[in-house]
Amino acid sequence: MAKISCSYLLILMLALSVFSVVEKAKGDKRCSIIIDLSPCYPIECRLSCITERNGDGECVVSKVGSTPNCLCTYDC
């Protein structure tokens, strides 16, 4: 009897965790845009992204050897 109830409890917890992850993923709509800052300085990138889109900016390199670009990620 204890094994059956323990199994049901485990399945219930698994199902609840899956539904909570799905709901969280639906609510977080994030968009990204490249801000033209050449060269990209992390502080300027963050400030520009905050003022323009109220988002998070970071310098990223799209290809090896290329100059970094400012990638701004914000709520859509």
From Swiss-Prot:
Localization terms from the record: Secreted
Protein name: Defensin-like protein 155
GO biological process: defense response to fungus; killing of cells of another organism
Disulphide bonds in the chain: C31-C76, C40-C59, C45-C70, C49-C72
GO annotations of cellular component type: extracellular region
Signal peptide extent: 1-27
Presence of keyword Protease: no
